Amino acid sequence: MTQLFKRAAVFTDIHFGMRQNSKAHNEDCTAFVKWFCETARKHDCDTAIFMGDWHHHRATVNVSTLNYTVDAVNHISKNFERFFFIPGNHDLYYREKRDLNSVPFLKNLKNVILVNNVYTEGEASLVPWLVGEEWTKMKNLDSRYVFGHFELPSFKMNAMVEMPDHGGLNSGHFPNQEYVFSGHFHLRQQRGNVHYTGNAFPHNFADAWDDDRGMMIMEWGGAPQYIAWPDAPKFRNIELTKLIEDPGKYMDENTFIRITCDADISYEEANYLKETWQDTFNLREINLIPAKKEEHAQDWSGDVHFESVDQIVLTQLAAIESEVIDRQVLIDIYNQLHV
């Protein structure tokens, strides 16, 4: 039996056009794609699989972003025998149907397969963003491996918020698979046979301190191997008193950093530190934030659960149930407000 791949290189959720079509972000995406292809060649990968959310904006694609996209897709196409492209929810004009997507030009590339319907070859299946009642058919898949863009409950949407269960697709709908690999949630995580591989690289402060992103290599019959992109952007939240002990441990040219001023220093001293560290480490971005002061002390007894404002907002957004409102888009917009 002919199988889908011998050794596949896999990545997901790169989101070209993020941050208002930021040139810096699109160039990060381009650099990642080049590293991905180079790493795949070193590991003799014959097949590339992308698991969804190539573009960030579903309704429009900026002309500059489109040029980055075309160059990146062509680069991947030239480096693999076949490139399977699974559209995610961000790649679709309508969340609830797959009639229109933001990458129609893929049809013109002979070795690029746009997976607009469930595609099975040998013992592997590729599944696009599911619409309508398609999720009910997943339990009938008997493929050894499944790759898709799934929104499964009980997995974390980010480091703080767990996806609630709305009674639809869940990990129990994949009883026949050895491995189920998915994009959509950017945090790398695994439960049972389901693996969210983690997206290409951190995108904002919702990803602070979480550098387990990059690519996966999957050899047929083997176990997944994860490789982090060494030049990925890094997002850091840290107290000044901790940072000042060893600045070089936490900062480099790829770092976005927010520093909480938990020491009694003047405005001039804070600015001096900021300018010095910016010049020394060539940081992407640095911000000093005043520490919050408690007006009243209070003794607490019993079990108390604390939630940050971010946790509260993201939990509420995740709980939205609507046929016209895309909660993931709202969450992405909220996360971008922190960059």
Q: What is the predicted role of each segment?
A:
Residues A159-A223:
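Conserved beta-sheet core of the metallophosphoesterase superfamily
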Residues T2-A9, Y119-L126, L141-Y145, V194, ...:
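Beta-strand-turn-beta hairpins that frame and shape the catalytic cleft
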Residues I76-N79, K139-D142, S171-N176, Y250-D252:
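Short, conserved loop/helix-junction motifs that constitute active-site signature segments
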Residues L4-F5, I14, M18-Y119, H173-Q177:
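Core catalytic region of metal-dependent phosphoesterases/phosphodiesterases
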Residues H15-R19, H56-A59, I86-K97, G132-E134, ...:
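Active-site environment of divalent metal-dependent phosphoester hydrolases
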Residues W220-V339:
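Accessory, non-catalytic peripheral segments of nucleic-acid enzymes
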Residues T69, P87, D91-G172, A200:
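Conserved catalytic scaffold of divalent metal-dependent phosphoesterases
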Residues D13, V33, A48, D53, ...:
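Divalent metal-coordination and catalytic microenvironments
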